[in-house]
Amino acid sequence: MNNNDPLQIDYWDRRKMLFGLGLGAGAFLTPGLYAESLMNPTPKQTEGPFYPDKMPLDTDNDLLVIGDSITPAVGEVSHLSGTVLNVKGQPVKNALVEIWQVGDKGVYLHTKDNRPGRDENFQGYGRFLTDSKGRYYFRTVKPVTYPGRAPHIHVAVTVKNKRMLTSQCYINGDKRNEKDFIYKRLGKVGQKLTSVNFKPIKGTKTNELDAVWDIIIGLTPED
């Protein structure tokens, strides 16, 4: 889509479609569910060298299609969604969630990533502003590996112009995680908090996947 609005794709229209395809409403947390005890925050991880140094013309939350193009990116279509919460279990509204990742051939949208085969139809970066219940949503591709790294998606969360978290998420159960030096140093708790299940969505013609990852950040000044 030819728009840089973080709320470009209507969140609820997409979620209603997914619910209709057999996904339960339990994919989202009830606000304050864990408010009686502090939650473990999503562990901070390196931003890495490939945060886009030149933003694409399109920075919305649909990474599969750039601008008015009718040619989608190559890869397993994945719907990544979840809730941004603070450690009290309270939803964080108006949080800017950014993601960036390699395309199907393992190449980033970055001028210094000169490996061949970058998918010109893959946006490579997207952003979304959480709603009043702290929810976010992206349509992207299932992450793939490249030399030295297990498949992963980078994420950053910013609240009122303050970067609250920089992290990464991984495919739960992927054997390549065991050899990834960043994943290994997270420890068991950190690994659990950043491992995401990519589950097939019944009824989709292209075998689309649903991935739910709740992101826990530290307290903001308002908290």
Whereabouts are the PLM-identified features?
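Peripheral, solvent-exposed domain-edge segments
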Residues: N4-P6, D10, G20, G218-D223
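Beta-strand-dominated extracellular/periplasmic modules and repeats
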Residues: E36-N197, T204-D223
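Generic hydrophobic alpha-helical segments
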Residues: G24-A25, G89
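N-terminal secretory signal peptides
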Residues: M1-W12, A25-A27
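Membrane-topology and secretion signals of cell-surface/extracellular proteins
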Residues: L21-G22, V77
